[in-house]
C-alpha cells in the first residue's frame, strides 16, 4: 500500500481508503462479512475509513468503532459526518445556516458520532452537505474551530454535493476546511477544473468518492441488471441512463491494456492525480478488498492512456431518477424530524 499526505494535517493515509456507506444496513449487507472485510483491509495496509451517522442511523459507525478497538496498536484514521438539520440532500441553494448547520446541531451530532464509534475523539468530522453561501454566517467557522480546540476532532472537512464541485471552492480558499470529499472518477472529472487547483494552493486534502461510478466502472452491469427491493440503483441505472452508461463503459473496456481490469483502470485513473489524497471505494466483500488494495502497488497510468481517458468526461443531466434525488428521499427515511 502506498501512502499520501492528507493535506495540511500531515497525516500519512493509504491512497486506497475504505468507504462504509454500504455497511449501514443496505440491501445485501452482512455485519460479519463487513467486519471480516474491514480487518482484511487493515491487514493489507488500509488506514483511512469514511463513515457517517446516516449510514444506518449510526450502524456503520458502530462497526467501524468495533474494528478500531480490535486493532489498538495500529493508527487508523477515522472520518465521519454530521447530517444537515433539515435533512436535505443536496443542500438547497437558498438555505440558511440556521436550517442546516447551526452550531448546537453540529456539537450534538459530533457527540452522537463519538458515542456510536465508542471513541473519545475523531480524526476527521465532515459536514455531510455544503453550500458556499453559508460562509456569510461567521458562526460556522467559529463552531468548527471550537470543535478542534475541544479535542473532540483533529480536523474538519466538507462533503460536497453531487455535480457541484465548484460549490466548495470559496470554503477552501477561506481556510474553513482541512479536507473536501467529492465525486471524482473517469466520468466525473469536473473537480479538476476549479476545486483541485484551490485545494492544491491551500494544502487541503481531497477524498475522492464514488470511484467506480456507483458500480458502472466495475464492468459488471448489463441491460438486464436489477437490484433487490427498493435499492436506489434501480432508479439510478434505469432507462436512458443505463443504456448510455453501458455504451460509455463499453468504450472504456476497448481501451484496457492486456491483463488490466476495468476497476483497476478506474482506480488508477484517480490515483494518477497527485491532488487526490485518498479514494474510498465501497468494499463489503473480502475479494473486493484484496483486488482494490492491490491496485496501489501498480502506480499511475501511462501518460498516453491517461490522456485518452480524459476524453471520456461525462456531464450527466440531473433528472428525477438521479442519485441525488433518490438519496435525498432515502436519507430522510433514516433521519429524525427536527
Model segments located where?
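N-terminal binding-site loop/beta-alpha segment at the start of enzyme catalytic domains
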Residues: 1-76
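Conserved, mostly hydrophobic/aromatic
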Residues: 6, 18, 34, 41, ...
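Acidic (Asp/Glu)-rich catalytic clusters
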Residues: 8-10, 67-73, 77, 114-118, ...
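Short, acidic/polar
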Residues: 29-41, 100-117, 162-171
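Beta/alpha (TIM)-barrel catalytic core signal, keyed to glycine-rich beta->alpha loops juxtaposed to Asp/Glu
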Residues: 57, 129-321, 332-338
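A short, structured active-site edge motif that brings together acidic residues
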Residues: 74-87
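Surface-exposed, active-site-proximal loop segments in enzymatic domains
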Residues: 86-100
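Active-site groove signature of glycoside hydrolases
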Residues: 114-133
Amino acid at each position: 500500500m502506498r501512502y499520501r499526505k492528507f493535506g495540511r494535517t500531515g497525516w500519512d493515509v493509504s491512497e486506497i481508503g475504505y468507504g462504509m456507506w454500504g455497511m449501514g444496513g443496505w440491501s445485501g449487507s452482512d455485519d460479519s462479512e463487513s467486519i471480516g472485510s474491514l480487518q482484511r483491509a487493515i491487514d493489507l495496509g488500509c488506514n483511512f475509513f469514511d463513515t457517517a451517522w446516516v449510514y444506518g442511523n449510526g450502524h456503520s459507525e458502530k462497526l467501524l468503532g468495533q474494528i478500531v478497538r480490535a486493532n489498538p496498536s495500529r493508527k487508523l484514521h477515522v472520518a465521519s459526518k454530521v447530517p444537515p438539520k433539515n435533512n436535505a440532500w443536496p443542500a438547497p441553494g437558498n438555505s440558511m445556516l440556521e436550517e442546516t448547520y447551526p452550531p448546537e446541531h453540529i456539537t450534538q451530532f459530533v457527540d452522537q458520532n463519538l458515542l456510536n464509534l465508542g471513541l473519545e475523539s475523531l480524526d476527521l468530522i465532515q459536514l455531510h452537505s455544503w453550500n458556499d453561501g453559508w460562509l456569510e454566517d461567521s458562526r460556522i467557522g467559529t463552531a468548527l474551530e471550537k470543535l478542534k480546540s475541544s479535542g473532540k476532532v483533529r480536523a474538519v472537512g466538507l462533503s460536497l454535493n453531487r455535480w457541484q464541485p465548484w460549490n466548495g471552492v470559496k470554503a477552501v480558499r477561506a481556510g474553513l476546511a482541512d479536507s473536501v470529499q467529492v465525486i471524482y472518477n473517469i466520468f466525473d472529472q469536473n473537480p479538476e477544473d476549479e476545486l483541485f487547483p484551490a485545494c492544491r494552493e491551500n494544502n487541503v486534502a481531497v477524498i475522492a468518492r464514488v470511484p467506480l461510478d456507483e458500480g458502472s466502472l466495475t464492468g459488471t452491469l448489463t441491460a438486464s441488471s436489477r437490484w433487490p427491493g427498493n435499492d436506489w440503483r434501480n432508479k439510478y441505472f434505469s432507462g436512458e441512463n443505463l443504456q448510455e452508461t453501458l455504451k460509455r463503459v463499453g468504450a472504456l473496456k476497448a481501451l484496457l491494456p492486456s491483463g488490466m481490469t476495468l476497476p483497476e483502470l478506474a482506480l488508477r485513473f484517480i490515483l494518477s492525480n497527485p491532488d487526490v489524497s485518498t479514494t474510498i471505494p465501497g468494499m463489503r466483500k473480502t475479494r473486493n478488498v484484496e483486488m482494490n488494495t492491490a491496485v496501489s502497488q501498480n502506480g499511475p497510468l501511462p501518460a498516453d492512456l491517461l490522456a485518452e481517458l480524459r476524453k471520456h468526461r461525462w456531464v450527466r443531466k440531473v433528472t428525477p431518477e438521479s442519485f441525488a434525488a433518490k438519496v435525498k428521499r432515502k436519507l430522510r427515511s433514516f433521519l429524525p424530524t427536527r
